[in-house]
Design a protein with these regions (language model features):
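Histidine-centered active-site loop/cap adjacent to the catalytic His
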Residues: 334, 406-410, 422-463
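Proline-aspartate-enriched helix->loop->beta-strand connector
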Residues: 228, 232-237
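N-terminal secretory targeting modules
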Residues: 1-135, 149-150, 168-177, 231-232, ...
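Extracellular serine-dependent O-acyl
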Residues: 40-42, 346-364, 369-371, 387-423, ...
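Second-shell loop/turn segments in exported
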Residues: 142-151, 209-214, 326-331, 426-430
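Solvent-exposed loop/turn segments at secondary-structure junctions
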Residues: 142-145, 212-217, 242-247, 359-362, ...
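Serine-dependent acyl-ester chemistry module
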Residues: 243-396
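Serine-esterase "nucleophile elbow" of acetyl-processing enzymes
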Residues: 114-210, 223, 237, 257
Length: 463
C-alpha cells in the first residue's frame, strides 16, 4: 500500500514537471543573435584598435597579400568597378571592346608594376623605337605574365632580357668565341671560324611583357594586330595554350565575367549584385576578418590559384571538357588564331616563337617536390586525364603550324621539361616560380640566338 502511494506521488510530480515545461522563446533568441554579433563586432574593433592592428587588418582581403595583389579587379569603360563583381583584387583591368579587357596603365603593388602603356614593365615603352633598341614582345596569359612572382624581375620577360643582354656583353668580352663579321679567305682558317656560333645583333635588347592574365589565343590575336605591331617589334614570343583548353568553344576570347548576363538579363544581374553585396558586407566586418586573419588563415585551392579571370566556383576539371568533339573545337579555335598570328607576323617580317606553356601533369611524378605532389593530388585523377588529352591535341596543332609555316614560326613544347626544370617549379597547376621562369627564358634564348633576323650574317667569302 505504501509503495502504491509513493508511486502515485512520483507520477503526480512527474506530471506537474511536464506541465511546467515551456517552449523555448524563439523570438527573443532570434533577436539576441544580431545583438550578440554587433557586440562582438564592437568588441573586436576595440581590441584591434587598442593593439594598433587596425591598418594591418584593413589591408587584409581574406587571402594572402600576394594573392590579393594578383587578383583581377574588373573595371568598365568608365573605370568604375562592375556592380556584382568582386572588387577585392588590386590588379586593375579595364574592358576593351576589341581585346575583351586590358591592364590599366600606371599602377603598382608590392609584387608588380604596370607602366603607362599597360605592360608589366618598370619603364614606359615609347611608340617610336630608339635607334639602338632591339624590341621583343612577350604575349600570353597569366603564366607569361608571371602570376604569383614576387616582382617584375622574376618573370620570363625580365629573365630573357637579362640573358640576351648578357650574350651581347659576352660577345664584346670574348669576340674570338664567335664567328667574325668578315670571313677569312684561306680554307684552313675558314673551316675553323664557320664552326663558331654566329654573333647576335648588338644593341640594347628589351623584352616587353605584354601578357595579360586570362588571355587566350583570340585575345592575343586582337592585341597583336591592334596594340603591339605599332611598336615595331623585332620578334614576337608567345607562351600560351592552357586557357584555350578551359575556354568554351562558343567564345572567341576571354571576357570580363558575367558581361552577357549583365547586358541581357537585368534580373540576373540584380541577383548577382545583391549576392555579391551581401557577401562583401559579411566578409568586410572586423569580426570575420579577424577570425580569418589570426585564426583560420584560409588558403586558396589549386583550382582557385590557377583560374585567374573567372568568378565561377568549381574545380579545374569542370572547366576542362570531357566531350572529345568540344575539345576538338577548342583546339581548332586555338589553331585558327595561331595561323592568323603567323600571317600577321609573316607579312610584317617579324620572327615568331610559339611556346606551349608548362603544366604540372607534364612532369615526372618522381621529380615533383612534396608541395607539387600535394597540388597534383588535390587536382585529382579526372583533371589529370582531361588535361593530358587536351595537351596532346595542342601539341599536334603546334606541329601542324610548324609544318605549314617552317620559315615563319618556331614552335616549342614546354609541357615536359623535367631535365631542365628545377626541383620545385610550380606554385599551382600552371604558374611557375622564378627558377621555373628561368628555365623557360633559357629555352627561348637558345631559339632566339638562332633567328636570322637577330644574327649578324657575315658576307660569303670571295672565291
Amino acid at each position: 500500500m505504501v509503495s502504491s502511494v509513493k508511486y502515485l506521488t512520483f507520477k503526480s510530480r512527474r506530471r506537474t514537471y511536464r506541465k511546467s515545461r515551456r517552449p523555448l522563446p524563439i523570438l527573443p533568441i532570434l533577436v539576441s543573435i544580431p545583438v550578440v554579433l554587433i557586440l562582438l563586432e564592437l568588441l573586436t574593433r576595440i581590441v584591434v584598435g587598442v593593439t594598433g592592428k587596425s591598418a594591418e587588418l584593413a589591408a587584409y582581403e581574406g587571402a594572402p597579400t600576394i594573392v590579393t595583389d594578383y587578383c583581377l579587379k574588373f573595371l568598365g569603360e568608365n573605370r568604375q568597378p562592375y556592380d556584382g563583381l568582386s572588387d577585392r583584387g588590386r590588379l586593375n583591368v579595364q574592358r576593351h571592346q576589341s581585346v575583351g579587357y586590358g591592364l590599366v596603365g600606371n599602377q603598382k603593388s608590392n609584387s608588380w608594376r604596370i607602366n603607362e602603356q599597360g605592360f608589366r614593365d618598370d619603364n614606359p615603352v615609347p611608340l617610336i623605337k630608339p635607334k639602338n633598341e632591339i624590341r621583343i614582345f612577350l604575349l600570353g596569359g597569366s603564366t607569361a605574365f608571371g602570376q604569383w612572382n614576387k616582382n617584375n624581375q622574376a618573370t620570363v620577360a625580365s629573365l630573357l632580357e637579362a640573358r640576351l643582354n648578357e650574350r651581347v656583353a659576352q660577345q664584346k668580352r670574348s669576340p674570338q668565341k664567335y664567328r667574325p663579321a668578315t670571313l677569312p679567305y684561306f680554307k684552313s682558317e675558314l673551316d675553323k671560324v664557320v664552326k663558331l656560333p654566329l654573333r647576335m645583333r648588338e644593341g640594347q635588347y628589351r623584352v616587353i611583357n605584354a601578357a595579360v592574365p586570362g588571355y587566350a589565343s583570340g585575345n592575343q590575336l586582337a592585341q597583336l594586330a591592334l596594340q603591339i605591331l605599332p611598336y615595331q617589334p623585332d620578334a614576337i614570343v608567345i607562351l600560351d595554350g592552357y586557357t584555350d583548353l578551359i575556354l568554351p568553344s562558343n567564345k572567341a576570347q576571354t571576357d570580363i565575367p558575367h558581361t552577357e548576363v549583365f547586358l541581357n538579363n537585368a534580373p540576373g544581374h540584380f541577383w548577382i549584385y545583391l549576392t555579391e553585396q551581401l557577401k562583401q558586407a559579411v566578409t568586410s566586418t572586423y569580426l570575420v576578418k579577424a577570425a580569418q586573419y589570426w585564426l583560420l588563415r584560409p588558403q586558396p585551392s589549386a583550382s582557385q590559384m590557377s583560374l585567374v579571370a573567372t568568378e565561377e566556383a568549381g574545380s579545374l576539371e569542370q572547366h576542362l571538357t570531357a566531350d572529345s568533339a568540344e575539345l576538338k573545337r577548342r583546339v581548332g579555335r586555338y589553331q585558327d588564331y595561331q595561323k592568323q598570328i603567323v600571317t600577321l607576323t609573316k607579312g610584317a617580317g617579324i620572327p615568331l616563337i610559339v611556346g606551349l606553356q608548362p603544366e604540372i601533369t607534364g612532369r615526372d611524378t618522381s621529380k615533383l617536390s612534396p608541395k607539387e605532389q600535394a597540388i597534383l593530388k588535390e587536382l585529382g585523377s579526372t583533371y589529370t586525364q582531361r588535361v593530358k588529352s587536351g595537351y596532346a591535341e595542342l601539341l599536334q596543332a603546334n606541329q601542324k603550324l610548324q609544318a605549314a609555316f617552317p620559315k615563319n614560326v618556331k614552335t616549342l613544347n614546354f609541357y615536359k621539361l623535367d631535365d631542365e626544370f628545377p626541383k620545385e617549379a610550380f606554385s599551382d597547376a600552371i604558374h611557375l616560380s622564378k627558377e621555373g621562369n628561368a628555365a623557360l627564358a633559357e629555352r627561348f634564348y637558345r631559339v632566339m640566338s638562332g633567328l636570322p633576323k637577330l644574327q649578324v650574317l657575315p658576307p660569303k667569302p670571295v672565291k
